[in-house]
């Protein structure tokens, strides 16, 4: 769902970056490549670079996750950042509700600016259906 919005924004000429919070350990490297082996040997940071893209992989010693403000500073040349996760952070949020339950984020925090759900909710916020992609993208751009 977020991928569709990113695609629509980029089609409008917007330079989009995204940040995704992982709730589990993850690895974007491929086993047995040089960069993977550098990390396994003890390198705390590895940069992999080609003519098409580059990536920086940083190993965290303290197991403490980076705050969104620190991660945002790592981005450059972007018009908008789409963030998935980081519910407790202070940035503005559009809550996407996939199933019916009563523990809505918009009831718990003040920085939800809109809701996306196929159900009508008792929320004093702009509400969109999941298939209203253009309306959601335009809302984001105007906000």
Regions found by a protein language model. Give the residues of each.
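N-terminal phosphate/diphosphate-binding loop that engages ATP/GTP or pyrophosphate donors
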Residues: 3-60
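Short loop/turn elements that form and flank the Walker-type P-loop nucleotide-binding site
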Residues: 42, 76-77, 109
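Phosphate/Mg2+-binding loops and adjacent switch elements
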Residues: 80-142
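Short secondary-structure boundary/capping segments
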Residues: 37-38, 72, 104-107
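Anionic group-transfer/hydrolysis microenvironments
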Residues: 22, 51-52, 61, 86, ...
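Structural motif corresponding to alpha-helix initiation and N-cap regions
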Residues: 31-32, 65-68, 130
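Phosphate-binding/switch loop-helix module in NTP-utilizing enzymes
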Residues: 59-88
């Amino acid at each position: 769902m977020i991928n569709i919005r990113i695609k629509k924004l980029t089609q409008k000429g917007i330079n989009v970056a995204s940040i995704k919070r992982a709730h589990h350990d993850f690895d974007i490297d491929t086993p047995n490549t040089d960069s993977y082996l550098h990390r396994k040997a003890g390198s705390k940071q590895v940069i992999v670079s080609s003519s098409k893209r580059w990536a920086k992989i940083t190993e965290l010693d303290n197991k403490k996750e980076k705050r969104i403000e620190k991660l945002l500073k790592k981005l450059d040349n972007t018009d908008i950042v789409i963030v998935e996760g980081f519910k407790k952070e202070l940035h503005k949020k559009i809550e996407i509700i996939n199933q019916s339950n009563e523990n809505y984020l918009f009831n718990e925090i003040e920085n939800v600016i809109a809701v996306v759900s196929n159900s009508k909710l008792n929320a004093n916020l702009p509400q969109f259906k999941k298939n209203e992609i253009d309306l959601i993208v335009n809302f984001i751009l105007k906000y």
